[in-house]
């Protein structure tokens, strides 16, 4: 399944979500998150930007990104949602968060952006302002080796300046992809808390 809503659950504030995978591809951990969101009534799409390729090794994942190039990755992200309705929440893990950030900022109708271990500088994505109708939620491990406070702060300033809501949640762990059960950085407590906070954001 890639976008079904499971029967019997119909919350009044059900959202339609696009969940982008990380540099490691559409791993089981991403699909598990999608299923959990479906179980509480949301409709979730999980585009595969790698055409089936999945990685467990960091260097192999980095090589894949280098092979594609960031512009191509973002182009694939935009193409993946082109056939969908406009009123969507965009979410993603790591590189997938950057994809979610781009699409949420540039595709009219976005209802929110959930960036897990992810934000990029707005100027690097080619625009100066953030849409006033698109709230943002950012999640990071406190000791994530890829965390850049200046980038997070700059995004917060731009989003708040637009009038949109901005939430930042930090977690007492040191890994990057701490929500993927099959990755060395997995932290079950932090992953569950992040999921709970995402669910609350989707209610707003």
Residue ranges and their predicted role:
Residues 32, 102-106:
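Active-site signature of alpha/beta-hydrolase-fold catalytic machinery across serine-
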Residues 143-148:
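Acidic catalytic loop of the alpha/beta-hydrolase fold
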Residues 92-96, 100:
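Gly/Ala-rich beta-loop-alpha elbow adjacent to hydrolase catalytic centers
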Residues 1-85, 178-179:
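Serine-hydrolase catalytic machinery in alpha/beta-hydrolase-like enzymes
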């Amino acid at each position: 399944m890639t976008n079904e809503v499971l029967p019997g659950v119909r919350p009044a504030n059900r959202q339609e979500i696009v969940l982008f995978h990380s540099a490691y591809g559409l791993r089981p951990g991403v699909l598990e998150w999608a299923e959990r969101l479906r179980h509480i009534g949301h409709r979730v799409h999980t585009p595969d930007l790698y055409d089936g390729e999945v990685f467990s090794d960091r260097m192999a994942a980095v090589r894949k990104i280098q092979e594609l190039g960031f512009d191509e990755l973002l182009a694939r992200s935009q193409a993946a949602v082109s056939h969908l309705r406009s009123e969507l929440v965009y979410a993603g893990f790591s590189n997938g968060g950057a994809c979610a950030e781009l699409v949420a900022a540039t595709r009219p109708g976005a209802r929110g952006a959930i960036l897990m271990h992810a934000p990029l500088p707005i100027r690097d994505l080619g625009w100066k302002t953030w849409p006033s109708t698109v709230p943002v939620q950012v999640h990071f491990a406190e000791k994530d080796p890829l965390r850049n406070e200046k980038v997070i702060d700059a995004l917060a300033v731009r989003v708040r300046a637009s009038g949109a809501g901005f939430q930042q949640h930090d977690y007492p762990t040191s890994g990057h992809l701490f929500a993927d059960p099959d990755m060395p950085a997995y932290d079950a407590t932090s992953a569950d808390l992040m999921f709970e906070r995402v669910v609350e954001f989707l209610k707003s």
